[in-house]
Amino acid sequence: MDILSLIGRTKNLFEDDINALDKDLKEIVSSSSFLVIGGAGSIGSAVTKEIFIRDPKKLYVVDISENNLVELVRDIRSEFGYINGDFKTFAIDVASAEFNALLAQSGGFDYVLNLSALKHVRSEKDPFTLMRMLETNIFNTDKTLAQASDMKSKKYFCVSTDKAANPVNLMGASKRIMEMFAFRHSLEIDVSMARFANVAFSDGSLLFGFQKRIEKSQPIVAPNDVRRYFLTPKESGELCLLSTIFGENRDIFFPKLDENLDLITFSEIAKRYLANLGYEPFLCENEEEARKLAKVLPKDGFYPCLFAPSDTTGEKDYEEFFVDGERLDMQRLQNIGIVKNDANFDSKKLEIFKNNILNLKSSLAWSKEDVLREVFELIPNFMHKETGKYLDEKM
C-alpha cells in the first residue's frame, strides 16, 4: 500500500535534503561506530536501516524486545544483505547490569542514538505505567547520556515529540523534561534531537490498528476531529539520522509541514485506507452496531466504521513543533526546520525532580497526582488536559 498517497503527499519529504547531503552522510557513517538503543521499534528499526545501508564500521542495536530484534535482523538480511563492519543485536534492558557490561566491553561508540520510549498518551492512565514512562523517557535517557559522555562519544541523539511543545499530556511532558536533562548533559557531550509527528503505521499507532482490525474482521474506529501530521517510517529514520550527523549541539530537528496541506484527520485516512482495499465506509452509531456489522458487511463491499469526536485525556487539539520564544533556523535545510537552543536548565530543580520521583518509586505507594505535582514544578505552565476518560475504555 502506498503510504504517501494515504497521507496526502506525492514524494518523500526529505528526498532533497538526503540527496544534497548523502555523499557526506555516507563518508561519516562508513567511518563511524553506532549504538542504537530501542533500535527494533518502528522508528528505531527505520534509523537502524538508514545507518546499515551506509556501511558503518560498527552497528550495535539494543532493544528489550527479543522478537522485534529477530524481525529486524530478518528484514535487514532479506532486504540489504551484509556489511563489512560489525553488526550485532542485543535483547537487553538499558537500565540493566548487562547493558553496563556491554558498554564496558564494546570499545565505545562514536554515536549513540536513543529511540526507546513509551509513546502513548494512554500510558498515563494508571500510576504504575506512568512511572515506567518517566523511567524510560527521562531517567534511562539521563543514564545513557552520562554513559555516552564517559565513553567520549561524539554525539548523543534522542527522540523528542511534537507533544513536548506546549504539552497537554504526561507523555509530552515527560519528553519536555527529557529535553531539559539532555541540555544539562550538553555541557559535556554534543546532543541533538528530533520532534516529529505521527509515524504512519508504526507499532501501536491508530493506522497500525486499522491493519489489525481488518485482519481480524473488526470495525474501524477513529476520531473525526483530530488532525495530525504524518511521516512515513523511512522519513522518520532519515530525520533521526540527519539530526544525529548534522545537528549542532542542542539542535532539535523537525519536519517542515504545512498545516493547510499536511494536517489530516484520522477518519479521512481511514476512508482512504478502506478505499485502497476496495471498501466503502459504513458509518455506525455505536460500538455494538459496529461489532455486529463487522461480521457481515465486508462481503458486500462495505466496512463498518465508528467516527466520533475525541473525548479522552491528553488529546491535543492541534500539533506544533516549536513554541513562541524558541529560536528557529528555517534556512539551513530545505524541508527540515531547526530549533536552536541555549543551555537553559535549572540543575537544582532537575535533581529535586529526579530525587522526588525516585523516592515516590521506592515508597511503592505513589499516585498520579503525586507525579503531576512534581511535573508542575518543572513545567509550571503545563496545561494538563484531564477528562477522566482514557482510550483503554473505548473500542
Give the location of each predicted region.
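Strand-loop microenvironment adjacent to phosphate/nucleotide-handling motifs in alpha/beta enzyme folds
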Residues: 6, 24, 28, 184-395
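A short, basic/flexible loop-to-alpha-helix module at the beginning of a structural domain
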Residues: 9-32
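Conserved glycine-rich cofactor-binding loop
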Residues: 40
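Hydrophobic/small residue at the entry helix of a nucleotide-binding pocket
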Residues: 43
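NAD(P)H-binding glycine-rich loop region in Rossmannoid oxidoreductase-like domains
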Residues: 46, 50-56, 61, 77, ...
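Helix N-cap at the beta1-alpha1 junction of Rossmann-like dinucleotide-binding domains, i.e.
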Residues: 63-68
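Rossmann-fold cofactor-recognition segment
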Residues: 80-96
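Conserved Rossmann-fold NAD(P)-dependent oxidoreductase catalytic core, especially the SDR/UDP-sugar
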Residues: 114, 118-176, 184
